[in-house]
């Protein structure tokens, strides 16, 4: 069995007039993330980690931000397509460990819903998805609530 590890990172700016999609769910917040798609930083970080582990470049390569078909797309669709892409090389997901950095909104109560939604999209157990939330203690762009970032590490194995 061949086991590979991948790492992903994403960041988007918080702006007024956008919905806040994070971890595949819609959160109530006065600002949302700016991007070509729905700008779900957690899903994007997971996609990049999966693609990296399979040595298949990155999310921007497969789903370019200048392509009209991805304008305002639900990032869960991109995640499903990413899982299908890595499957073409014989890989399946072992587990995911992710961290979201945001001052607000507080995410603790939303993590189980994120795990469930993402597990359904990827066809894995929610128990195989660890999501943690942290702040930057009011430091940097995240601390000033100018943006949200996410990091993801994945383990994939060849079936």
From Swiss-Prot:
- Gene Ontology terms for molecular function: 2-C-methyl-D-erythritol 2,4-cyclodiphosphate synthase activity; metal ion binding
* Record-given protein name: 2-C-methyl-D-erythritol 2,4-cyclodiphosphate synthase
Coiled-coil segments on the chain, per record: none
Instruction: Give binding positions for 4-CDP-2-C-methyl-D-erythritol 2-phosphate.
Output: 10-12, 36-37, 58-60, 134-137, 141, 144
GO biological-process terms attached to the record: isopentenyl diphosphate biosynthetic process, methylerythritol 4-phosphate pathway; terpenoid biosynthetic process
Q: Which family does it belong to?
A: Belongs to the IspF family.
Matching SUPFAM superfamilies, A to Z?
IpsF-like
Q: Describe, as the record does, how this protein assembles with itself and its partners.
A: Homotrimer.
UniProt keyword annotations, A-Z: Isoprene biosynthesis, Lyase, Metal-binding
What does the note accompanying the cofactor annotation read? Binds 1 divalent metal cation per subunit.
């Amino acid at each position: 069995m061949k086991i590979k590890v991948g790492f992903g990172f994403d960041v988007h700016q918080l702006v007024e007039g956008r919905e806040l999609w994070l971890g595949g769910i819609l959160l109530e917040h006065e600002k949302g993330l700016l991007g070509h798609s729905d700008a779900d930083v957690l899903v994007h970080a997971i996609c990049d980690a999966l693609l990296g582990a399979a040595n298949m470049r990155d999310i921007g390569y497969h789903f370019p931000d200048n392509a009209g078909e991805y304008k305002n797309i639900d990032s869960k669709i991109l995640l499903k397509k990413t899982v299908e892409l890595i499957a073409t090389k014989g890989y399946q997901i072992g587990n995911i460990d992710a961290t979201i950095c945001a001052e607000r909104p507080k995410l603790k109560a939303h993590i189980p819903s994120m795990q469930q939604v993402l597990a359904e999209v990827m066809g894995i157990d929610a128990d195989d998805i660890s999501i943690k939330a942290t702040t930057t203690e009011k430091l940097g762009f995240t601390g000033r609530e100018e943006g949200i970032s996410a990091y993801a590490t994945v383990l994939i194995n060849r079936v």
